[in-house]
Amino acid sequence: MKRFWQTAKKKGLVLAALAAVLVLCGTVTLRAQWGGAVMASAEVTNWGLRFGEEGQPPAGNADEAYLAQYNALFRADTEEKVLYLTFDAGFENGCTAPILDALKKHNVPATFFLVGNYLETQPDLVRRMVEEGHTVGNHTYSHPDMSAIADEGSFRQELEKNEALYRELTGQEMPKLYRPPQGKFCQSNLEMG
């Protein structure tokens, strides 16, 4: 990994490498308001992107109009050339500090979707994310297949337990951004989110 960063730095590819993570981690982000009625849905979507012509934005495998009904999105205004850099952080493997260093060096903000284990075991890195102006989103407490959770109480528990850890750690409310684990979601998840 060290060699990768050295080579990338020499070739000026640090931001390009970080941008590639966005492509690899492309999943639905829900701007959750933690409210709404629940309706059962058996159809599970395994989130993914497909890429068309060079220079064109990727297309998701869920219709943007459908997602918009639930205040969910995977990309914003396509007329504006903006890249939203996001990371899923379920465990620490030594990469987060160098990523944060690179983001800071280039003054690039990012969003980190964290699970409970990360919040519990990496408090210094979480605080650093917040102090350096990054956004921390909710990736659930235990990273289950949320599309398999049918009752709203269990669904909320996964999100609220993570929110409580974040609040205890940072003294702030966790932003209402949710990314479903494994990229799996269904209509009832969108309604509960």
Identify the residue ranges that each predicted region occupies.
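N-terminal pre-catalytic segment of deacetylase/amide-hydrolase enzymes
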Residues: 2-86, 91-105
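Structural recognition of the beta-strand scaffold that forms the well-ordered cores
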Residues: 83-86, 110-114, 135-140, 176-180
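Second-shell loop/turn segments in exported
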Residues: 85-86, 90, 114-115, 143-153
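Short beta->alpha connector loops
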Residues: 90-93, 116-119, 183-185
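Catalytic domains of cell-wall/extracellular-matrix polysaccharide-remodeling enzymes
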Residues: 98, 120, 143-193
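Acidic (Asp/Glu)-rich catalytic clusters
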Residues: 99-106, 119-139, 193
